[in-house]
Amino acid sequence: MDRYPITGRSLEWFFDIDGDLFERQYKRHLSGYRQWKDTPEGLHAGQWRVFPQNIGPHLSIDETSLSRGELYTIVTNKEAHGRKHSIVAIVLGTDSDVVLRALRQIKSELRNKVKEITLDLSESMHRICRLAFPKASRVIDRFHLQRLALDAVQEIRIKHRWDAINADTDGRESAKIEGRKYVAERLENGDTLKELLARGRYALFKSPEKWTVSQRQRAGMLFRLYPDLKEAYRLSQNLRTIFNRRSTKDCARLNLARWYNSVAQAGFKSFNTIAATFYEHADEI
């Protein structure tokens, strides 16, 4: 009973008590909640909770949505691997000033012992790490970088999908004006063009070796019909390969330089922006 949350009613049979009454008594008197909420810690419990005892040399900071779409900033101890005592701080919202105010509840001696902190590309996250953990080196999580490349591929797919939707709408309107039945052209797998572009999104998130038979077919059709989508997918997969390959820092930089050249030759604006971002944060990747 001490380890797992239970209801007051579940105790009725064992102890011959009124479970609802016991819950009210526990909340109002036994729990000490009314006294705790007026303490320095309790006053800010709606905004943040900080656990200095969980801090370690290797931390991670990220934002996540926990309830009703509300964003929270969470600082975790990487050495706990998501288990008990992982959370160092959880703060409502992403305002860097509020997050810094919460983290400064932890003594500076403890914060100065942090050696490394993993984060994303957000400027506010960089500001938080720089001011709250001044002696920690900052490392940008590779998965945030790969996500940018995947989003760039999806951006091209979405553009083509809207073109297909507009063409389909125009075809239907023309058929209605001419008094004939509109029949959308179907491809060899039975999809219309706009259906192919919608259903093909899942294949573009995966590497080729993880495609199912139908995904492989759809990807092949997409790449045949849209060469720019094929080139964008190739760039994203090349970046994934660079990150997955075990190599020295100098070798990785050489591979990234080659990738930059491929991006420049392809001429995609989104990928050029990603390459510029990589170049700016090269020492932190």
Could you describe each region identified by the protein language model?
Residues 8, 68-69, 78-84, 100-104, ...:
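Acidic/histidine-rich catalytic cores and adjacent linkers
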Residues 1, 11, 59-64, 117-120, ...:
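Short, conserved catalytic/metal-binding motifs centered on acidic residues
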Residues 6-25:
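Short, basic interhelical loop/turn and adjoining N-cap
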Residues 150-162:
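Short, surface-exposed amphipathic charged segments that create phosphate/polyanion-binding patches used
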Residues 21-118, 123-128:
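RNase H-like nuclease fold core
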Residues 135-151:
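Inter-helix linker motif
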Residues 16, 27, 276-279:
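Short amphipathic alpha-helical surface patches that mediate protein-protein
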